[in-house]
Amino acid sequence: KERAMHVGRKKGQIVDTVVQEQRPSVLLELGAYCGYSAVRMARLLLPSARLLTIELNPDNAAIAQQVVDFAGLQDRVTVVVGASQDIIPQLKKKYDVDTLDMVFLDHWKDRYLPDTLLLEECGLLRKGTVLLADNVICPGAPDFLAHVRGCGRFECTHFSSYLEYSQMVDGLEKAVYKGPGSPAQP
């Protein structure tokens, strides 16, 4: 059974709220798919802000670019084709990113933790950077959840919801980076 893999309306409202609260100047999305969430988030950004969205599948990236162009948001959104683990280390030099204000994780769930660690290792997270991860319950990202909730460097909030267009329990995890030296809380 196939399903639409975008964030959907209900979880999209949670994403909207987080973007509106954070007001990011530089937002990174991991997993563009068809461009739905990129457009959804970019429409809420200030005109001077930018969103970079990384998509592994070139066909999906081409569709995402068309959707972004159709929405008139091509000045704010850059669609980057490639593997997240290859692109993240290039963000500072090739894409002129100092640090990220927000990261929306919605790609391969087994990449959530390695990419979070890579973002930190590359110096792209700053105190206050918000990670917002979709589908942390279904299909799930247990290693990511264990890390952000247990390492002491993130302040976490869970938003319960349902998998897009179904009644399967799912959720988003908001993890606010406290800095590299934050001690674990007992």
Curated annotation (Swiss-Prot):
Top-level taxon of the source organism: Eukaryota
Function text: Catalyzes the O-methylation, and thereby the inactivation, of catecholamine neurotransmitters and catechol hormones. Also shortens the biological half-lives of certain neuroactive drugs, like L-DOPA, alpha-methyl DOPA and isoproterenol.
Record has S-adenosyl-L-methionine as a keyword: yes
Positions carrying Phosphoserine: 182
PROSITE patterns: SAM_OMT_I (PS51682)
Gene behind the chain: COMT
Organism: Sus scrofa
Annotated Mg(2+) binding sites: 106, 134-135
Co-factor remark: Binds 1 Mg(2+) ion per subunit.
Protein's name according to its UniProt entry: Catechol O-methyltransferase
Swiss-Prot/TrEMBL GO biological process terms: catecholamine catabolic process; developmental process; dopamine metabolic process; lipid metabolic process; methylation
Keywords: Catecholamine metabolism, Cell membrane, Cytoplasm, Lipid metabolism, Magnesium, Membrane, Metal-binding, Methyltransferase, Neurotransmitter degradation, Phosphoprotein, S-adenosyl-L-methionine, Transferase
Residue sites binding S-adenosyl-L-methionine per the record: 7, 29, 37, 55-56, 82-85, 106
Compartments (UniProt record): Cytoplasm; Cell membrane
GO molecular function: catechol O-methyltransferase activity; magnesium ion binding
Enzymatic reactions: a catechol + S-adenosyl-L-methionine = a guaiacol + S-adenosyl-L-homocysteine + H(+); 2-hydroxyestrone + S-adenosyl-L-methionine = 2-hydroxy-3-methoxy-estrone + S-adenosyl-L-homocysteine + H(+); 4-hydroxyestrone + S-adenosyl-L-methionine = 4-methoxyestrone + S-adenosyl-L-homocysteine + H(+); 2-hydroxyestrone + S-adenosyl-L-methionine = 2-methoxyestrone + S-adenosyl-L-homocysteine + H(+)
Membrane-protein topology: Single-pass type II membrane protein
The organism's taxonomic lineage, starting at the top: Eukaryota, Metazoa, Chordata, Craniata, Vertebrata
Gene3D superfamilies per the UniProt record, alphabetical: Vaccinia Virus protein VP39
Main location as per UniProt: cytoplasm
Entry binding sites for substrate: 109, 135, 164
EC id: 2.1.1.6
A single Gene Ontology CC term: dendrite
Family per record: Belongs to the class I-like SAM-binding methyltransferase superfamily. Cation-dependent O-methyltransferase family.
Cofactor(s) recorded in Swiss-Prot or TrEMBL: Mg(2+)
